[in-house]
Amino acid sequence: VTVLVFGAGGQIGQELLRSLSGRVVCAVTRSGRLPNGRGCVQADFGQPETLRALLDAQRPVQVVNAAAYTAVDRAESEPDVVFRINAQAPGVIAHWCAEHGVPLVHYSTDYVFDGQGTSPYGVDDPVAPLNIYGASKLAGECAVRAAGGCSLILRTSWVYAAHGHNFLRTMLRLGAASECLRVVADQIGTPTAAGLIADVTAQLLMEQVQSRHAGIWHLTAAGQTSWHGFAEEIFVQAQACGLMMRVPQVQAIGSVVYPTAARRPGYSCLDTTALVEAFGIVLPDWRQGVRGVLDEIVNRSR
């Protein structure tokens, strides 16, 4: 086995299988099956102590951890489960990788920040998560870094894809059934296609990740918008590519009008300059990612 991918059935995981299609890959999911029904290796992040035996059996040369608990609001009601999956499990994986000299790529989130900033956050800016999900991902970062070894932690944001549960797919579903939608306009971030994250990850792995690369990096598309702006762009492009005959009116609202169990940062854009300069990576505008995902949905429906 060359590359072991935890969370291969998720949004980023499925895209990783595409990006790494030229490599020997061991796919790992919670159910032991991929979305296409094919069998794969099973792992339960709710039982972190079992992961070491799995890694011993597979002996990967590189590891990517795309598994996570990502239900931000539900996380508020079951913090023990969330921390096992998002903090303890990555720590076990990172320790195994450090002991065996295996590079690890682990994903984190913009929600480690409190959103009080007004310009893109750098990797060394102070962290102060507002919710259980963000706190668990920060604990995961700390666990991975404490293990030592060659671990790259890629913080990303507002992830979406043509598959899975995400904002873009939710908007398409609601927009087809409604003439008017109300969407939060006072949370600012960068929508980032899972395919972009996977492609950059594959490039990093191909560059033979070295210990000097270890640490935290920020990886998002370029630009910024609000959830309201994201929704409007989705509908404009969906109509342009023939996915929707009519588009709903999108009304901008404040977060106070749409209360959620978990508090979210008002501003969570990430500064990707370090990643771009260190690896020569080109990060396209976020709107380009929307177009690519909508094109994929159109092609799948044919």
List each language-model region with its residue ranges.
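Adenosine-cofactor binding site in Rossmann-like domains, unifying the SAM/SAH pocket
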Residues: 26-50
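Mid/C-terminal beta-alpha module of Rossmann-like enzyme folds, strongest
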Residues: 200, 207-260
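Catalytic helix-loop patch of NAD(P)-dependent Rossmann-fold dehydrogenases
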Residues: 84, 88-92, 112-154, 158-159
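NAD(P)H-binding glycine-rich loop region in Rossmannoid oxidoreductase-like domains
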Residues: 42-85
